[in-house]
Amino acid sequence: MWDLAVREEDYSAVDAMLSRYARAPLSMRLLPVFARGDSAARARFIEEATNLDSRQSQISARYVATFLEDFAAAESLARLDLAERRRPPIRLGAQLFLAWLELARGRWSAANAAFETAKRMEGASGVEIERAIAATMPFLEVPKADIGHIRLEVARVNPNDGGPAASSGLAAGLRPHLRLYLLSVLSSRLGDDQAAARYADELEALPTVDNAGPVKRDLALTARADIALRNGKAAEALALLQPVQGEVPLELAYYKVFATVREFGQEHARYLRAEALVSLRRYDDALRWYRTAFQGSPAEPVYLAPGHLRQAQVYEARGEREQAAAHYRHFVELWKDSDPPLRAMVTEAREKLARMTDGGR
């Protein structure tokens, strides 16, 4: 209910909920203060966050990034958890969050550097996998040299050495499958369709554990859909993704105390589905996916800007200028400082927005 009230910007309802929750976490109490712009109250909350030795600062940062789309404030909050007096797992989580926040800004170069910093921190494990997931995001312009390096890095990963966070359970049993999936999608990014298909074949042939059959199937289908969509085969990609319906065991959603990304959360499949629907001009269906498909995901902030851009383009194609302008405005703000390869999209969006808000002249 809190999440719904926040998404609807019903902060009176949020206040009412918090009044009934005597020990509400800092992150839940902080968000309405930031939303209202109360500078004095904001300073008090920042002081409280500074003195905590918990993950509340980075959880607050995620809320501020997701619900308020204020990436600068989110960064400031997350950096509080980098203080030397914080415990190593908290510092590592904050560093990884900052890497994903850079991706949300369209800044692969800064995100890549942040991942490198995380790799050198105490207790770091699995950072290579997180960075590989980041590099596969379809809307980013990742240099091929970086993708090639990351593919080699993933190829060298020992799938049986997942570190303490994945030392047992279903996630550990699926690490070999995740590795092959990432190798397939990274190969697709490089235009190496033969290798991408080969890795997908290996993934399908790999035995699975417990109740993870649908997870393995969906990883392989997503990899194949990625290849199809990159080759302009939207109908084929959509058909491949039809069985991918979120059959993810609860254990895989909650095996980490605090996650910056869910390795098996199917966000990539959802984004590919939305892209395929746009290509097929199934605009109503596409809009539904862009609006809601990433809600609740730890990586939701990363999908905000590309989601706004696609919604703007769809509304523009349908002649709905007011809605298109609103989404272009959000997109331009979120990616205004993106990496150079993405700036042409930002410039084009800014020009379209100017025409829409200037009476079409």
PLM regions: where:
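TPR/Sel1-like alpha-solenoid repeat signature
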Residues: 4, 95, 102, 114, ...
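Structural signature of alpha-solenoid helical repeat junctions
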Residues: 53, 90, 123, 171, ...
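Terminal, low-structured helical/coil segments at or just beyond the last alpha-helical repeat
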Residues: 325-361
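"A position-specific structural signal for the A-helix of alpha-solenoid helical repeats
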Residues: 28-31, 59-60, 97, 130-134, ...
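Short coil/turn linkers that connect adjacent helices within long alpha-helical scaffolds
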Residues: 84-86, 122-125, 169-170, 209-212, ...
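Alpha-helical adaptor scaffolds
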Residues: 222-300
